[in-house]
Structures are given as C-alpha cells and as structure tokens.
Amino acid sequence: MKRLTMLMFLLLPLVLYGEDLPFQGVVGKVIDGDTIELKSGELVRYIGIDAPETEYSRKKQPQAFGKEATEANRRLVEGKTVRFEYDKQVKDDNNRLLAYVYIGETFVNGELVRKGFALYSPFSPNKSKNILLLQCENEARKNKLGIWALPLRNPSKEYLASKAGKEGIIKKFHLLECPHARRIDARNKVIFSSIDEALDDGYRPCRICNPLERHNH
C-alpha cells in the first residue's frame, strides 16, 4: 500500500499537467544558487529554497553571497546527471520546472541550505520537504555557516509580525519600516527582539523588506 501511495504521488503531476516531465537530465548551465538549465533546454528552479541574487535585487545590485551560492551549486551539479522529484505544482509563472533535485543520494536543495548557501523558503502548495529543509537551515544557522556568518544589512532591535492567522498561511516577520509592518493591527502585533527569536517561533522573513539581507564581509 505504501509503494502504491508513493507511486500515485510521483505520477500526480503528470496527470494534472498532462505532459511529459523529465525525471532526470544533464545540467548544461548553472544560472545561480537555486536555478539550473538542462542541456535539453529546460530551466529548473529548486523547490523550497532561495539563494541570493547574482544579477539584481530590488536595489539593482547583486546580493551578498550570490556568487558564492552560484559557485557552490556549480560544484554540485554542473555537467552532471541529476534526477528530479516533483510536488503538487510542477511549473512556475516563468514556465520553469519546480523540482527537488538529487545527484546520487545527495539532496541538492537541502545541501545548499545546510551549508548556508541558500535559505529555506516555503512555497505553497509544494510542502513535502518543508520539515527537512527547515532542519537543514537550523543546522546552518546554529553553526553560522555561509549566509549566517555575514552581518545584517539592516540590523534592528525589534522586528514586527502579526499573530498567526489561517492554518497553512506562512507567517512573516518584518523590519519596522516595512509597509506591511505598518498595516498590522495593534491587537495582532507580535514583537521579536531578534531574528533568531522570530525564526524559532516559526516565522519567515518578509520578501519585501528582507530582514535577513546581508552585507559581504
């Protein structure tokens, strides 16, 4: 029964999208720390992680540790045959494949997070590896690896968040000046004295104000 359930889970994306999805491929080019291009031409975005940008950010500048993250991804996969596992959503709005990527027994998404080259970034509805990826991030954070060793770009004595709402909604924390923070009702306001406190309470960084953004040494 367990084997049948797993097979149905793996085949579900094929049924929903009605197309042939690659379950392995040779990596022709590493785009950045969380995206690759196969020799067959498909772009693949790693599910559940977010590496620093190398080409641009909201400030039109590369982000700290972007080059290092790209190079780490390159060392892991470039020119090699990788295999894919899919979740409920198999393509994003840019028509990139969304996948959990493996090389041999190495879970590439998790390895990049575990060594501090990328952050855990939950993405609904693709949730099957969330617990594992969060464990990888906690390990990197505890050991101050990679991104976690760099100083914050905008350090703050306080971070704001809203009390948990509907089940399944990702809880976010914000810098004080973030527009989303200003809209939080006083009755629902949660104040954290550190990023670690917010993360330990299950909150994730806002993608608009990006309280985890770092400086290069």
Regions found by a protein language model. Name each.
Residues 2-10, 14-217:
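Small beta-barrel nucleic-acid-binding modules, primarily SNase/OB-fold domains
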